Amino acid sequence: MPWVRFDDQFTIHRKVDGLSDAAYRLHTSAIFWCARNLMDGFVPEEDLDLVCARLRAPARFAAECVKRGVWHDAHTACPSEKCPAPVDNHDGWVVHDYWEYQPTREKVLADRETKAKAGQKGGIASGQSRRLHAL
């Protein structure tokens, strides 16, 4: 499970501060949803209702997120290196500068693999030490 990171200035950033309450909720929920699903900041249009299930008419608030610059259309290239490349085969949105604070899918998977290998080594070493002490 990846952790979600927020800067302590997040709530007063000029782009976020101008969002309606519903758009703010959608934006923050999208960050959590993207982290949980390893989506690299991409919110597919067909999954928008899943991102913030209690929000009515989420497409309206997605449009507000785009207008305020916290999201952009998934087909639009962003000059920021902190945004994933445009998504060609799906409609949706990208959380702008997602990689500024959130790890990439690739990094999360690599970290999981590293921890799994370390856990296996720890278990082997632990079992060997118990057998040696029993002698």
Give short role names for the model-derived ranges.
Residues 1-109, 113, 132:
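Positively charged, structured surface patches that bind polyanionic biopolymers
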Residues 112-135:
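Arg/Lys-rich, low-complexity, intrinsically disordered N-terminal tails that contact nucleic acids
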